[in-house]
Amino acid sequence: MIPMKRVHFEYIQIHLASPERIRKWGERTLSNGEVVGEVTRSETINYRTLKPEMDGLFCERIFGPVKDWECHCGQYKRVRYNTDLKNDIVCERCGVEVTESGVRRHRMGHIKLAAPVTHVWYLKGIPSYISIILGLPRKEVEGIVYYNNYETTGSKEIARFIKDKQLLERKDRKIIDQSFFSLDEESELFSGAQAIQTMLSSLDLKTTAQNIREELAATEDWSEEEEDRLRKKRNKLIKRLKIINHFLATGAKPEWMILSILPVLPPDLRPMVQLDGGQFATSDLNDLYRRVINRNNRLSKLNTMLAPEIVVRSEKRMLQEAVDALIDNGKRGRQALVGSNKIPLKSLSDIIKGKQGRFRQNLLGKRVDYSGRSVIVVGPQLKLHQCGLPKEMAIELFQPFVIHNLINQGLANNIKAAKRKLQNNDPSIWEVLKQVIQGHPVLLNRAPTLHRLGIQAFEPILVEGRAIQLHPLVCPAFNADFDGDQMAVHIPLSLEAQTEARLLMLASSNLLSPATGQPIIAPSQDMILGCYYLTTENPKFQIERGHYFSTLKDAVMAYEQKRIHLHSYIWVRFQGRIDTKSTQEEPIEIRIEESGFCSTIYRRYQYRSFKNKKELKTAATPFYNSENAYLMMNKKKMSIPQKPSLESNNLSLTATATATATATATATATATATATATATATNANDHYFVQYVRTTPGRILFNQVIHECLELNEIHP
């Protein structure tokens, strides 16, 4: 095994590569002094011998042997001759280095292009860096690159550009030097990507940046009308200055956006596999590379033959299109190249971009141990910090912990016996699993993880089924919904990881967005609708009033028994302070009943007075209807209406004139008791006062939900 050299680095920087660096990637010198690396033939393998063709896309001399320690001709075969990298053996016949076949995964080659070509990302991308740095429209630059404006051998497009105002300085600029654009109609130097390369190489970045800064400084003296008219031009100058500053900061040169040497990927990254029927399945990159090599070789041959200019230009354009298809097939509306099955070929960009690309699929989305994946469904019964974990998944993820506990508790003698219990679904494993997951958080992640809240910690709750249950309020942080989304589960193994997950990553501790500081957990959609329905007032059920309850639980129980509606007005005995808008609120009604009960009724609450504790206990029955009690009163002793009203807009009193004075005194005593707002109080005459609040069963249920959320979501690690 070849020893691997460890390289420690702090960061990775991606920038333009120079032609020398690209050549260095794909070129190396063998121990016999031979320099290899250039791919000159488009053949892949010999279909008779099934061996790679020399100097082709799978050449063993360039990329390394197909089999370990075996050369192409077979002189060195199946023997590990030497492990010293300084004295590698090279076959005298075929020139293949005798080493491991794993080198074919990282050894690159290169293609020396017969004519420069532009990189399609920098030409047709948004923004087009080549057109911005040159200060020309993108369509004009493309016209030069693809020869769309050339009909004869004369360079009409170049002549037009020389006269164009965009290539002239304002006053003190001179016409472009002869070395920049030759006026010779017969010269092919100024057509295609070679013309763009000449323009970029002659560009002085520091001088251009200074000129742009001076021009931007002059715009500060513009009037408002001129500024509105020339704002678009100012924005272009700023954009051009930013790109030039990036080139100056990184040390890259603009002409490196033009390719003269094309790198070739290692063959194991674009494999060719033989099928059962004798046919071969190959990567689309091989077809794209083959097209580039064929056109490049044909162009080289035309140059040596001194072919007509129009033929050479046509071949250069075809080479440019072939390289464009290799880098990004179908970029910016171009018709994509298709294979034999009429399906567009996958280019280098298609391989690395998107959800199925190399970065997100293979580098960021690797499969790891102690992890699982399943569809998420809503779990409204869960707390904010909880998630429902399927039993089938939990027993697999926590298997080492379960086995350890089975042995420690004496339920299994060894690991083999513990695994047998797991395979047989022994009932004892579920109790052990509950003990294991108690206090052991799990991590839930939904790809793509675009910010810190894309992965959070939860306390697992064992559930039936095969779907992960999630609290609906944590969905905005994951950008998840319940239409088939999947989430991954990861198990923190060490105590340090578990502690960090509980302290820093628990869902109930991440309520604010790290980007904006605004709450990221807020009720929405059907939750808001449900809260509104619980707390709304329904006039249809306002006539169902007069029900008295001693506790909130009794009111909820009556609702569950369907004795009252969700929106029915009820009176509930309440211990606590009542806040009202007015400190001098007048009672709506004062009622004196035959039994001696005196009720002072306000809009949202009331007080009832009793002579002794016995009457107080009688009034504190779980379900008491004041209207039914009123019908049982002795109507002969008191002149009162047949059906008293709980609320009256004109503040009318339902007691007789004789009872009015007593009621007024009672109301005064009641108003004094309002400050304390206790459930039971006494006055100077030893009358007992009970406080009631008017509400609905829906509001009681709403308050219970809010209190449960506030109390149970407080996690103490």
From Swiss-Prot:
In plastids the minimal PEP RNA polymerase catalytic core is composed of four subunits: alpha, beta, beta', and beta''. When a (nuclear-encoded) sigma factor is associated with the core the holoenzyme is formed, which can initiate transcription. Its cofactor is Mg(2+); Zn(2+). Binds 1 Mg(2+) ion per subunit. One of its GO terms (cellular component) is mitochondrion. Its main location: plastid. It is an enzyme of class 2 (transferase). InterPro entries: DNA-dir_RpoC_beta_prime, RNA_pol_asu, RNA_pol_N, RNA_pol_Rpb1_1, RNA_pol_Rpb1_3, RNA_pol_Rpb1_3_sf, RNA_pol_Rpb1_clamp_domain, RNApol_RpoC1. SMART domains: RPOLA_N. It catalyses: RNA(n) + a ribonucleoside 5'-triphosphate = RNA(n+1) + diphosphate. One of its GO terms (biological process) is DNA-templated transcription. This is DNA-directed RNA polymerase subunit beta'. The keyword Transmembrane helix does not apply. The keyword Metal-binding applies. Keywords: Chloroplast, DNA-directed RNA polymerase, Magnesium, Metal-binding, Nucleotidyltransferase, Plastid, Transcription, Transferase, Zinc. Its EC number is 2.7.7.6. It comes from the Eukaryota. Belongs to the RNA polymerase beta' chain family. RpoC1 subfamily. The lineage of its organism: Eukaryota, Viridiplantae, Streptophyta, Chlorokybophyceae, Chlorokybales. Mg(2+) binds at residues 481, 483, 485. It comes from Chlorokybus atmophyticus (Soil alga). Disulfide bonds: none annotated. It is found in: Plastid, Chloroplast.
